[in-house]
Curated annotation (Swiss-Prot):
Its main location: cytoplasm. One of its GO terms (biological process) is rRNA processing. The keyword Nucleus applies. This is Gem-associated protein 4. The modification Phosphoserine is found at S86, S205. GO terms for cellular component: Cajal body; cytoplasm; cytosol; extracellular exosome; Gemini of Cajal bodies; membrane; nuclear body; nucleolus. Transmembrane segments: none annotated. The modification Phosphothreonine is found at T84. The modification N-acetylmethionine is found at M1. One of its GO terms (molecular function) is ribonucleoprotein complex binding. Residues 714-735 are annotated as: Leucine-zipper. Keywords: Acetylation, Cytoplasm, Disease variant, mRNA processing, mRNA splicing, Nucleus, Phosphoprotein. It is linked to Neurodevelopmental disorder with microcephaly, cataracts, and renal abnormalities: An autosomal recessive, severe neurodevelopmental disorder characterized by global developmental delay since infancy, microcephaly, poor or absent speech, and inability to walk or spasticity. Additional features include renal abnormalities, congenital cataracts, gastroesophageal reflux disease, seizures with onset in infancy or childhood, hyporeflexia, and non-specific white matter abnormalities on brain imaging.
Length: 1058
């Protein structure tokens, strides 16, 4: 508040005039000599001047001007005399009140106190008194008590009791600039206490102590002095109530008393105001409700920061006991009569009731001397007896129902406990939708921008609007609009709290089930919002997008989230942006208690119900994978808090575990989700896999691999995962074993051993090669179980390996088992190679091994994954290097013996021949029915992969020839010869196969011709041209036997261009 002009102005002129008239009336004496008895004759002009100044007609802030005038008067009273010229000059410049005070004649405390009493300004008196320095404050109250106790009138008693009541209600006014200026003036210019005339000897209090305590002790002493002048039931009730309240609040209550609940607080306010409304003599009877509420709050909110001294407490208790004995019968008679309906009587009974309750607690918890305990006990008994005889005053009072209006007034004026009252306002169904309730909500929206309040308002609106009450639809719409505005203004964490509450209370349909009819344009907003999101997905617009979705998601969470899930999968490139929006709402991790997926989170349910198992293209599957990753490991945009909506364990449980079967269409996608989840969460500190039951998870993967061992025996509809994806399943198994082993300490030793034993027993049901893949996992606990025939060709340690009878592994199958071991991993392949028992110096043993190797290769190849086949390819090269494997080279595609150095290409030629022999074996009468068409496609693809690597090897050897063999050793002719052989072998294999599966071999043949053509053009010599012509005719003769016609013609045309 602006201090305004305190110098010459209309108000000061009126005040000055009042004092001049009083001075004239008191002439020839000076006003500084005025006594109490003179006031009635002299004081009227001053009182009338003050009333004129503080009238509403005189100024827009009448109370402020009354305060200004009283401050000026009190400052004048406190001004020391005489004033030196230097002091005058200084204060004229610095003291805000000095210049205006000089317009007033010199006055004394009698004028100040009588003026305050005439104006009934007990509240202002205490505000100004408490603004003074502590010692001066005490001195001024002492003067007031001296003033009151001399020639005490009924008005003195009334004013004294009001002042005492105001002291107890005082809470300070730290934001009042007038009081601050008055306090500053007093601290700066007033003399110390000992410079005051007649200082009270008792006042040597600690300036740091609570300033109220000494004042209350002084007032208690004052009460004892004027006791005999307290006449009439009303005054006696007030005196007893003040004394009881002082003892209760400042002595008997705990050091940190619990505030009464907001409901009790409102009830107390309603009771006080109802009594005022019925008590026509009460000064607040005619006041507006807002003023009544403000004052009633002060009456019911007494608190203390300190305790009265023990001496004061027991003096007070004895005096209260004395007064009850002396006045008790008179007051009981009045209270039981029809006269006992005033606020004073209500206060007395209420204060004594509170005293009685606290006295019992005080006696139970406080250590007192025998004498002190007796004083309190006797008083408590006296109070209880008094209350028993007057209980009807509180019990039988019929109060009007004004609680709602009071609550709204508390909110409107933002009183001390207005936020607590907001919660009652938001929850009270009886008040909802009245005109006053709607108006209060509309004008105080800012107070309701709290998640709990928004939720309570929504609960109230839903309960009331779905009950039998007839409420206009327009009013419901208006209230919902107001609530949604409050929600829109919340922070993102606040919105999440509201969303969590909505999901908890009304489930996945949110507000829509109860309020959709009143939430205008939801479907239109939904479509418009998501059209804009998909068209302008960018981090710059993320905050706006989150705000738009926030409103939609509380109206209908299910529709909103499902729409986002669908768009994130279908709309290319939007998944990351939409995931960022979704992860801004961690409340979506809500776990539904009912429904088809009662154990799953709401987010998982929406994904499963909307997009899972409904993908139409590989791109949609890829977007779904990336969406899951973004929801598990959200990218944190600047300024927007996000949290994971999916935990890795629930992703595995919901999207992987149920689908780890070869006959399930989603198995391939589930494996990709599996590996993505493992890799994305590899760095997590906590061992999250524990919640997924890792050992059953390992067994599920082993079961899947077991089905691959019987892959081509299964019907086509049960082969939903290609053999190519076997490598992914193996990789996941290896990674999972590493993670579980690394976290073995999270299991107790007993549980770990039992889990390993359980898994080992379960693996006995599966193909033995599956168990071999867990060799490292079981190491130190179980030996590797392999077919007994493996021991016939390998030097296996019985400490590490054990033989087991396996069906299908009879005599002569040792090499088959050995080759299957080599497929498992590169490490085991090296180990098997080192343990192999073949005598290189025995040609017959090498020949038999080579034949056995070919037979085993034919048996293993069709069931190999690409990585397993590549290991066999490398193994074959190692065997050729070690001369353990003999592959005789035939002359079937050689017109003449070439005079070439083919040694650098020996392995490539042998491999090419070996592959030809393998396919001759596979296509033979005894084997051709092993595989369905898809199986032939698979082996052809494996062959083409090996032949492609073989061609790469030829190019590398040829290019490095001059540096390795010497400048004169050009290997061009040798490389061309190898190309012709590979080409012929490829065409030979094509001729044995069904045309439908030959496309990869046909492409490889064309690539081989390209290699031949490119290399032959680097040597333009006559002999080279002649050789090229011969080879061209020879290759064309081979190609003539190839079908169909289109392929044959393409190959011939390619060769004609050489």
């Amino acid at each position: 508040m602006d201090l305004g002009p305190l110098n010459i102005c209309e108000e000061m002129t009126i005040l000055h005039g009042g004092f001049l008239l009083a001075e004239q009336l008191f002439h020839p004496k000076a006003l500084a000599e005025l006594t109490k008895s003179d006031w009635e004759r002299v004081g009227r002009p001053i009182v009338e001047a003050l009333r004129e100044i503080s009238s509403a007609a005189a100024h827009s802030q009448p109370f402020a001007w009354k305060k200004k005038a009283l401050i000026i008067i009190w400052a004048k009273v406190l001004q020391p005399h005489p004033v030196t010229p230097s002091d005058t000059e200084t204060r004229w410049q610095e003291d805000l009140f000095f210049s205006v005070g000089n317009m007033i004649p010199t006055i004394n405390h009698t004028i100040l106190f009588e003026l305050l009493k005439s104006l009934e300004a007990s509240g202002l008196f205490i505000q100004l008194l408490m603004a003074l320095p502590t010692t001066i404050c005490h001195a001024e109250l002492e003067r007031f008590l001296e003033h009151v106790t001399v020639d005490t009138s009924a008005e003195d008693v009334a004013f004294f009791l009001d002042v005492w009541w105001e002291v107890m209600k005082h809470k300070g006014h730290p934001q009042d600039p007038l009081l601050s200026q008055f306090s500053a003036m007093a601290h700066k210019y007033l003399p110390a206490l000992d410079e005051f005339p007649h200082p009270p000897k008792r006042l040597r209090s600690d300036p740091d102590a609570c300033p109220t305590m000494p004042l209350l002790a002084m007032l208690l002493r004052g009460l004892t002095q004027i006791q005999s002048r307290i006449l009439g039931p009303g005054r006696k009730c007030c005196a007893l109530a003040n004394l009881a309240d002082m003892l209760t609040v400042f002595a008997l209550t705990e050091d940190d008393p619990q505030e009464v609940s907001a409901t009790v607080y409102l009830d107390k306010l309603a009771t006080v105001i109802s009594v005022w409304n019925s008590d026509t003599q009460n000064p607040y009877h005619q006041q507006a409700l807002a003023e009544k509420v403000k004052e009633a709050e002060r009456d019911v909110s007494l608190t203390s920061l300190a305790k009265l001294p023990s001496e004061t407490i027991f003096v007070g208790c004895e005096f209260l006991h004395h007064l009850l004995r002396e006045w008790g019968e008179e007051l009981q008679a009045v209270l039981r009569s029809s006269q006992g309906t005033s606020y004073d009587s209500y206060r007395l009974c209420d204060s004594l009731t509170s005293f009685s309750q606290n006295a019992t607690l005080y006696l139970n918890r406080t250590s007192l001397s025998k004498e002190d305990r007796q004083v309190v006990s006797e008083l408590a008994e006296c109070v209880r007896d008094f209350l028993r005889k007057t209980s009807t005053v509180l019990k039988n009072r019929a109060l009007e129902d004004i609680t709602a209006s009071i609550a709204m007034a508390v909110i409107q004026q933002k009183m001390d406990r207005h936020m607590e009252v907001c919660y009652i306002f938001a929850s009270e169904k009886k008040w909802a939708f009245s005109d006053e309730w709607v108006a209060c909500l509309g004008s105080n929206r800012a107070l309701f921008r709290q998640p709990d309040l928004v939720l309570r308002l929504l609960e109230t609106v839903i309960d009331v609007s779905t009950a039998d009450r007839a409420i206009p639809e327009s009013q419901i719409r208006q209230v919902i609009h107001l609530i949604l505005e409050c929600y829109a203004d919340l922070s993102l964490p606040g919105k999440n709290k509201v969303l969590a509450g909505i999901l908890r209370s009304w489930g996945r349909k949110g507000l829509s089930e109860k309020l959709l009819a009143y939430v205008e344009g939801f479907q239109e907003d939904l479509n418009t919002t998501f059209n804009q999101l998909t068209q302008s997905a960018s981090e710059q617009g993320l905050a706006k997008a989150v705000a738009s979705v926030a409103r939609l998601v509380i109206v209908h969470p299910e529709v909103t989230v499902k729409k986002m899930c669908s768009l994130a999968v279908v709309n290319l490139g939007t998944h990351k942006f939409l995931a960022q929006i979704l992860t801004a709402f961690p409340a979506l991790r809500f776990v539904e208690e009912q429904g088809p997926n009662s154990s799953a989170t709401f987010m998982v349910s929406c994904l499963k119900e909307t997009v899972w198992m409904k993908f139409s293209t590989p791109k949609e599957e890829k977007q779904f994978l990336e969406l899951l990753n973004c929801l598990m490991s959200p990218v944190k945009p600047q300024g927007i808090p996000v949290a994971a909506l999916l935990e890795p364990d629930e992703v595995l449980k919901e999207f992987v575990l149920p689908f780890l079967r070869l006959d399930v269409e989603e198995v391939d996608l589930s494996l990709r989700i599996f590996i993505q989840t493992l890799e994305a969460n590899a760095c997590r500190e906590e061992y999250w896999l524990q919640t997924c039951s890792p050992f059953p998870l390992l067994f599920s993967l082993c079961q899947l691999l077991d089905r691959f061992s019987k892959y081509w025996q299964l019907p086509k509809e049960k082969r939903c995962l290609s053999l190519d994806r076997k490598d992914l399943a193996i990789h996941i198994l290896e990674l999972l074993c590493e993670i579980v082993s690394a976290n073995a300490e999270t299991f107790s030793p007993d549980v770990w051993i039992k889990s390993l034993s359980w898994l080992h027993r379960k693996l006995e049901q599966l193909d033995w090669t599956v168990g071999l893949r867990l060799k490292s996992f079981f190491e130190g606990h179980f030996k590797c179980e392999v077919p007994a025939t493996l021991f016939e060709i390998c030097k296996l340690s019985e400490d590490e390996w054990t033989s087991q009878a396996h069906p299908g592994y009879g005599a002569g199958t040792g090499l088959l088992a050995w080759m299957e071991c080599c497929c498992v991993s590169s490490g085991i392949s090296e180990r098997m190679l080192s343990l192999l028992v073949v005598d290189v110096g025995n040609p017959e043993e090498v020949r038999l091994f080579s034949k056995g190797f070919l037979v085993a290769l034919v048996q293993v190849m069709p069931w190999c994954s690409p990585q397993e086949w590549q290991r066999l390819h490398q193994l074959t090269r190692r065997l050729l290097e070690k001369q353990l494997l003999h592959v005789p080279y035939s002359l079937e595609y050689i017109q003449f013996v070439p005079l070439l150095n083919l040694k650098p290409f020996a392995q490539e030629l042998q491999l090419s021949v070996l592959f030809l022999r393998t396919f001759q074996f596979l296509c033979s009468h005894s084997c051709r029915d092993w595989l369905p068409l898809e199986g032939w496609n698979h082996v052809v693809k494996l062959l083409c992969g090996s032949l492609t690597r073989l061609l790469d090897s030829v190019r590398a050897i040829q290019a490095a020839g001059p540096w390795v063999q010497g400048p004169e050793q050009d290997l061009t002719q040798e490389a061309l010869f190898v190309y012709t052989q590979v080409f012929c072998h490829a065409l030979h294999i094509m001729a044995m196969l069904h045309p439908e599966v030959c496309e990869p071999l046909y492409v490889l043949a064309l690539e081989t011709l390209t290699c031949y053509e490119t290399l032959s053009k680097t040597n333009p010599s006559v002999s080279s041209l002649l050789q090229r012509a011969h080879e061209q005719r020879f290759l064309k003769s081979i190609a003539e036997g190839i079908g169909p016609e289109e392929r044959r013609q393409t190959l011939l045309q390619k060769m004609s261009s050489f």
